[in-house]
Amino acid sequence: MEAARSGIEDVTSPDRISQLPNDLLFRILSLIPVSDAMSTSLLSKRWKSVWKMLPTLVYNENSCSNIGSLGFDQFCGRSLQLHEAPLLKTLTLELRKQTDSLDSSIFPNIHSTLLEFSIKSTGYPVYYSTISFPNNLDVFQTLVVLKLQGNICLDVVDSPVCFQSLKSLYLTCVNFENEESFSKLLSACPVLEDLFLQRLCSVGRFLFSISVPSLQRLTYTKEQAYYSNDEAILEITAPSLKHLNIFDRVGVFSFIEDMPKLVEASVRVKLSKNEKLPKVLTSVEHLSLDLYPSMVFHLDDRFISKQLLHLKLDIYDNFQSNLLLSLLKDLPNLQSLKLNHSHPSYNVEDQPCSVSEPSSVPECLSFHLETFQWIGYAGTFEEIAAAVYVLKNARCLKNATISLYSRGTENGLMMIKELESMSKGSIMCQLLVKF
């Protein structure tokens, strides 16, 4: 009674955390290493089975300091044997050392219905953890998402497996022993819809064949090559593809079939190596593309797209007005145009240019363009000519936003004044100049 009056809690009262619902306890335990979560089973009868029902398990080799003499693989395998949740939403393994026993020590001990499996290896780059997928394990039949990252070597030639439910596959810096391993992995995913590839690795110069009829989204990105022969060659057959994202200026991409369902694409490639690429982009509604001077030699009537509504152009080197205007005449239904000149390169003594205006105003300017955005506008003669032409001829333009790349306050103020004085073909146009 005295303790209650003084505001001191009775130490014999049940701990409040044990009264929390399981869902909240699961969230709390998911914030600590699995080895620590297992230790909570010693607290009381209430806690004995809480960790066994966790819907998410993250095994981090760097955080497992209290597993005694057990190796990391053995600890993972034994703890998974004790796990009782019928549904395991996510299982993550973060490896630090090389291991070749995942298929024998861990995979067979997963008894829950597993939806997402992630393996990340951060060991020394020279050493790879070899992963094989046994074909007699039910755990792979329920997987919806599979993520592999780091120093991992995949070998599926001798152990074919069927990921019959897999919808999303993420491969980041994963090594393949041969072309067949990559092809068999994809052929084992009959309902795959989302494929994310970042810097595929190989010993030698392989052809990576992507033949997935169900594929809807494909992303391939590549950082600066680590090795001189690290040049991707991808052969793509994906007739159901809707979204395409490629960022690799040295790779070669061959599209075997047309992709009539493609509606969105972001492409950062060297067109001189990928001359067939423009043909597969003719059905897109949203397109993000590099624009550089030499590109004019690789664009022709194959680039005409009546479906394109939104275009973003990343500009490199000096801006060329003629190249932009030649593109616009082939995009009759374009509604929004964004120019991003992040690092403009121009001579201080900008020389007057001769801009060849189209014989007729592009249809998109006369009837459809509503939004115009320019980032990195430096006020060169070429840029002024393009700005004047677009603002004057865009009859339906509602919003124009121009962000300046200026060499000084005085120069910036002059550009603002110049832009605001340009005539506008649309009475609805709201011009915003950012300095």
Curated annotation (Swiss-Prot):
Spans of repeat LRR: 64-95, 146-173, 174-199, 222-248, 266-291, 316-341
Q: Which domain of life is it from?
A: Eukaryota
Q: What's in the keyword line of the UniProt record?
A: Leucine-rich repeat, Repeat
Q: Which cysteines are joined by disulfide bonds?
A: none
Provide the F-box domain boundaries.
14-62
> Can you give the residue ranges of the FBD domain?
353-404
- What is the protein's name according to its record? Putative F-box/FBD/LRR-repeat protein At5g56810
Species the sequence originates in = Arabidopsis thaliana
